């Protein structure tokens, strides 16, 4: 049991690639928390995909013992948070579990959009913030300019910013001293009823669900019965401990401490992130503020390329859902793609990570249908329905109006590319809310429809700015707009997997582009195939794929013209009949590329 005055809980805030996980590695190394033999790069990023993409997805934690220059022994608890916008809720609750943050900024790059988003969350959580300028060993490093930028853009004093190189280890000791002397100790009462915040949870095949907790008040011991305050479920605590980063059992956790508990919990869904844990008897009366269950934002269909792998896909998705409470799924069937699942995600990176994990860890090839968002469909009878899949759109005669989700996008971009970025946002039906300058960079704030962003906005933004722009967004609610469902018909048959929701002004251009793309991708058949884009009963774009034909008159030498005519008419009748009964095979690549179009 550590005295409160000797505990420091902190997180590291940074944009992707600014060196957050490397700094965490150095802090662990400097304090000999892990033996030199067990040390490896990005120690806290356990998933392969985290290491490979160089991003942190789950919040990870480590307890570091440190003897400061004043001779006192301190316990430092670091929570390494994700930096990406999709995992913003993981960030916000990790922030509430600690009292201070190290703001890591790459001294060659400066402040980026996700740095801003996460710093504002830290400020909202009343954190003390210590700025750290990283990568000072690089020749392009410019600490004075970046320190000035931190003061201009974020508005915190950066005159005493610590200059470090996480790669070489320079400045790490100063960072540890700053954590001890500048960050506040946690507050809490040992004798009060137990209040613990559930920071994260994940599934372990042997122990069941492991729950990461921050004790606010009271104490937690092995063998006690605990209650989750959001759903009232009761569990018996099997073991408690701390991470150094390996699990180490302890007898009790007291106020201000961060550790884990296991209680034979079967599913991650029973442990909701941000929930309050208390004792079953004589528990706390009120829960901690700020709990909200995470809601999926982007939906798409996942189908196996080989339909025999459907059961394997089901197993894979069920196992991933055990570990990820923000990932939802339900079965769906598609006439074109067979059996699969309709899945909900927090955002596009979350979608990519899950898809990559299924393909890599379970070795299943997938087709992903076009990502779509949740629309609100207001019916004539006054009811409101949520529309997850454009193929389920009700008949327009019963619909009063549609509303789509909007986001507030913050884009940081060098001046030279500002025009291109503004044009891209206008093209995506954006409404400009703000434009400010900080040094040679502009900060643009736009109100954009989420539907226009989920497709390929991020890729387009990176390409028009040569990769220099950074982008962050948050949901701001729903607004009515003139939206229609566009269907694609191949040989007069609607293809459900290609249905999308588009704005009426855009429908024609989008439909034409899709038809042209399909015309190139579908192989020619023995009969003529019309490819059409339609809204309701009205066709707005059409391409015709011409038939392969055999030269039936080749055998006729001279002779009577009626003989040739007869053969040609016979062929024509055959083609007509074939078109009525013929099935068009649409190859898998056609789906994938038609959905990837730049619209």
UniProtKB/Swiss-Prot annotation:
Residues 5-187 form the tr-type G domain. The keyword Transmembrane helix does not apply. It catalyses: GTP + H2O = GDP + phosphate + H(+). One of its GO terms (cellular component) is plasma membrane. The keyword Cell membrane applies. InterPro entries: EF-4 (IPR006297), EFG_III/V (IPR035647), EFG_V-like (IPR000640), EFTu-like_2 (IPR004161), G_TR_CS (IPR031157), LepA_C_sf (IPR038363), LepA_CTD (IPR013842), LepA_IV (IPR035654). One of its GO terms (biological process) is positive regulation of translation. It is an enzyme of class 3 (hydrolase). GTP binds at residues 17-22, 134-137. Pfam families: EFG_C (PF00679), GTP_EFTU (PF00009), GTP_EFTU_D2 (PF03144), LepA_C (PF06421). It is found in: Cell inner membrane. PROSITE patterns: G_TR_1, G_TR_2. It comes from the Bacteria. Its EC number is 3.6.5.n1. SMART domains: EFG_C. It is a peripheral membrane protein. Keywords: Cell inner membrane, Cell membrane, GTP-binding, Hydrolase, Membrane, Nucleotide-binding, Protein biosynthesis. One of its GO terms (molecular function) is GTPase activity. Belongs to the TRAFAC class translation factor GTPase superfamily. Classic translation factor GTPase family. LepA subfamily. Required for accurate and efficient protein synthesis under certain stress conditions. May act as a fidelity factor of the translation reaction, by catalyzing a one-codon backward translocation of tRNAs on improperly translocated ribosomes. Back-translocation proceeds from a post-translocation (POST) complex to a pre-translocation (PRE) complex, thus giving elongation factor G a second chance to translocate the tRNAs correctly. Binds to ribosomes in a GTP-dependent manner. This is Elongation factor 4. The gene is lepA.
């Amino acid at each position: 049991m550590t005295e409160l005055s000797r505990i420091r809980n902190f997180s590291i805030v940074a944009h992707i690639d600014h060196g957050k996980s490397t700094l965490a590695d150095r802090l662990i190394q400097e304090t000999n928390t892990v033996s030199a033999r067990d040390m490896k790069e990005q120690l806290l990023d356990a998933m392969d995909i985290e290491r490979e993409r160089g991003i942190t997805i789950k919040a990870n934690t480590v307890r570091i013992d440190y003897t400061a220059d004043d001779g006192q022994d301190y316990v430092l608890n670091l929570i390494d948070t994700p930096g990406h916008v999709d995992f913003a809720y993981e960030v916000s609750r990790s922030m509430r579990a600690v009292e201070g943050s190290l703001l890591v900024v790459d001294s060659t790059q400066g402040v980026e959009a996700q740095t801003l988003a996460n710093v504002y969350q830290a400020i909202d959580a009343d954190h003390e913030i210590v700025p750290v300028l990283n990568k000072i060993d690089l020749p392009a490093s410019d600490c004075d300019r970046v320190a000035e930028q931190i003061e201009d853009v974020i508005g915190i004093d950066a005159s005493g910013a610590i200059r470090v190189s996480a790669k070489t280890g320079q400045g790490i000791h100063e960072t540890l001293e700053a954590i001890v002397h500048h960050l506040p100790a946690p507050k809490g009462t040992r004798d009060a009823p137990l209040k613990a915040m559930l920071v994260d949870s994940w599934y372990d095949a042997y122990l069941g669900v492991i729950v990461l907790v921050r004790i606010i008040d009271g104490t937690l011991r092995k063998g006690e019965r605990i209650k989750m305050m959001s759903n009232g479920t009761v569990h018996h605590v099997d073991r408690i401990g701390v991470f150094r980063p390996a699990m180490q059992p302890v007898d009790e956790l007291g106020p201000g401490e961060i550790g884990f508990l296991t209680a034979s919990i079967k599913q991650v869904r029973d442990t909701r992130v941000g929930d309050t844990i208390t004792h079953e008897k004589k528990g706390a009366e009120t829960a901690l503020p700020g709990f909200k269950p995470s809601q999926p934002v982007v939906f798409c269909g996942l189908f196996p390329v080989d339909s025999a792998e459907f059961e394997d896909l089901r197993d894979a998705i069920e196992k991933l859902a055990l570990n990820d409470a923000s990932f939802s799924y339900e079965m769906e069937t598609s006439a074109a793609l067979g059996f699969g699942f309709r899945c909900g995600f927090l955002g596009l990176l979350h979608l990519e990570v899950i898809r990559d994990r299924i393909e890599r860890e379970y070795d299943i090839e997938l087709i992903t249908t076009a990502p779509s968002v949740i629309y609100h469909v207001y019916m004539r009878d006054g009811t409101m329905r949520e529309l997850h899949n454009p193929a389920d759109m009700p008949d327009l005669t019963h619909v009063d109006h549609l509303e789509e989700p909007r986001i507030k996008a913050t884009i940081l971009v060098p001046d030279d590319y500002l025009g291109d970025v503004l044009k891209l946002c206008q093209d995506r039906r954006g409404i400009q809310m703000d434009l400010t300058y900080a040094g040679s960079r502009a900060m643009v704030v736009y109100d954009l429809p989420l539907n226009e962003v989920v497709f390929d906005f991020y890729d387009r933004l990176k390409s028009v700015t040569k990769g220099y722009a950074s982008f962050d967004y948050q949901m701001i609610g729903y607004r009515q707009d003139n939206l229609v469902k566009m269907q694609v018909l191949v040989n007069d048959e609607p293809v459900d997997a290609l249905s999308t929701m588009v704005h009426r002004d855009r429908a024609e251009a989008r439909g034409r582009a899709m038809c042209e793309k399909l015309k190139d991708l579908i192989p020619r058949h023995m009969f003529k195939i019309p490819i059409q884009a339609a809204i309701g009963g009205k066709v707005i774009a059409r391409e015709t794929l011409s038939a392969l034909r055999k030269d039936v008159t080749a055998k006729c030498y001279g002779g009577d013209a009626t003989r040739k005519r007869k053969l040609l008419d016979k062929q024509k009748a055959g083609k007509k009949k074939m078109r009525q009964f013929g099935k068009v095979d649409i190859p898998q690549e056609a789906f994938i590329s038609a959905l990837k179009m730049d619209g």
